[in-house]
């Protein structure tokens, strides 16, 4: 995902998402991942037969990973070794390799197929996620947003602010305020008695 997407459940929801490696969902989807980027997919057919147990998040996650592993083995899913190597280098925050224009365009095409976004966009997404890794560090020197941004690889605050707006739709301050409101809303619902149970 490269922009915010609202998820509004129409009923009870427990397992909300499965997170693949950036280049790992192509074979499961059965189509170029660029067709799914920032969109909504009907995955009912792909999940037919999966019955995760209600009220048990660990068992739900296991049921889903077991299903995915069975499909991987049955259908012979593969990864593109060139794309995987580039993704791993990005995840390690290694500098981008120098390529000819033709090689760069070929890599972009492979990325659109296997990852759904360009290498440059994936680098931006990973850098943005690192802001939160740095911001949530439980060390006294972790500092605030500015230090988290610098630690994640941003050169200045406006650059990070642009990514906050692009990926979350908020400034860092607005997002932090929303998280406080969300925590309060969850806490206020947590301690309310539910409706009476009918026998």
Predicted feature residues:
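DNA major-groove recognition helix of helix-turn-helix
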Residues: 111, 123, 164-165, 176
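Ser/Thr-glycine-rich phosphate-binding loops at phosphate-binding pockets of nucleotides
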Residues: 161, 168
């Amino acid at each position: 995902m490269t922009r915010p997407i609202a998820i509004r459940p129409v009923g009870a929801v427990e397992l909300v998402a499965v997170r693949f490696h950036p280049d790992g969902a192509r074979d499961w989807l059965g189509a170029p991942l660029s067709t799914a980027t920032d969109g909504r997919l009907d995955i009912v057919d792909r999940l037919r037969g999966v019955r995760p147990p209600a009220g048990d998040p660990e068992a739900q996650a296991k049921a889903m990973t077991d299903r995915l592993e069975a499909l991987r083995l049955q259908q012979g899913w593969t990864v593109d070794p060139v794309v995987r190597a580039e993704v791993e280098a990005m995840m390690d925050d290694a500098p981008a390799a120098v390529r000819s224009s033709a090689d760069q365009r070929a890599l972009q095409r492979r990325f659109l197929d296997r990852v759904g976004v360009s290498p440059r966009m994936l680098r931006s997404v990973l850098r943005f996620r690192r802001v939160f890794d740095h911001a949530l560090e439980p060390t006294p020197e972790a500092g605030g947003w500015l230090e988290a941004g610098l630690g994640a690889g941003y050169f200045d605050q406006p650059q990070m602010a642009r990514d906050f707006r692009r990926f979350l739709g908020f400034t860092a301050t607005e997002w932090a305020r929303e998280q406080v409101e969300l925590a309060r809303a969850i806490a206020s619902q947590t301690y309310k008695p539910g409706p009476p149970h009918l026998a």
